Amino acid sequence: MEVKLDFSSEDFSNYSYNYSGDIYYGDVAPCVVNFLISESALAFIYVLMFLCNAIGNSLVLRTFLKYRAQAQSFDYLMMGFCLNSLFLAGYLLMRLLRMFEIFMNTELCKLEAFFLNLSIYWSPFILVFISVLRCLLIFCATRLWVKKTLIGQVFLCCSFVLACFGALPHVMVTSYYEPSSCIEEDGVLTEQLRTKLNTFHTWYSFAGPLFITVICYSMSCYKLFKTKLSKRAEVVTIITMTTLLFIVFCIPYYIMESIDTLLRVGVIEETCAKRSAIVYGIQCTYMLLVLYYCMLPLMFAMFGSLFRQRMAAWCKTICHC
């Protein structure tokens, strides 16, 4: 590329810059990346997800609170999924308020960032503790302490604390900018900040939990096939469904985020075409991730005995009517 600048000594007299000539940059121009979905379509999707989230999770949470005396350890972790998805509903509501420029400031931006990142970090850790609990129930089936509901309560609290720790860095660097932007920024170091946050997010909420979950489920499957448990087929089905749902809905987003990190640190050469493809990929896979967290309690509540029994009773009542 050849850049032609027509300067003369008069342009720099008294340390001033008075250039008015033409600059030819050839085919060089800033990358313009448009959003894949329009603002109106995005608002409609957010409203739809908010309604599905609020109605579905309210049903599951109501069932848990009404029949809490019959709850088991897994049911407490199912309730954690409900609370997590309700935090996501709070984020969707605040995102809609920001799109219409209603009641936004830095404090509300930080609250929005907390709701979003808490919901993203909390679900993987709940899945980790579900796999740990499943492993304990298989390996320590004869121990009474494993079957106590206190285990589920402790695991739920631990997962919440770990999720808050993951969300905190995002909240600290989020600021509000007119007219309606909540941005993670650190002045001239914003690019390095986002690279670090992406790396932390990938390892803390994806690679680490996935590694622990795979180990626990592998040990559980090995133990199941070595013994003759009466519910072996049911447990294997639950483990398979849990893994498949995570692979289909979550892994694509983390793959795109990892590619974006590699692009930012220079491992992959950046071009406008690559940048556009990554942005579009992140937008699509992010929608899948949000949909997964919205529907997660309904899908996983079917594995919990409390909700499954109540649903069966309601269906029988409806059929008799």
UniProtKB/Swiss-Prot annotation:
This is G-protein coupled receptor homolog ECRF3. GO terms for biological process: calcium-mediated signaling; cell chemotaxis; immune response; positive regulation of cytosolic calcium ion concentration. May be highly relevant to the process of cellular transformation and rapid T-cell proliferation effected by HVS during latent infections of T-cells in susceptible hosts. The lineage of its organism: Viruses, Duplodnaviria, Heunggongvirae, Peploviricota, Herviviricetes. GO terms for cellular component: host cell plasma membrane; membrane. PROSITE patterns: G_PROTEIN_RECEP_F1_2. Pfam families: 7tm_1. SUPFAM superfamilies: Family A G protein-coupled receptor-like (SSF81321).
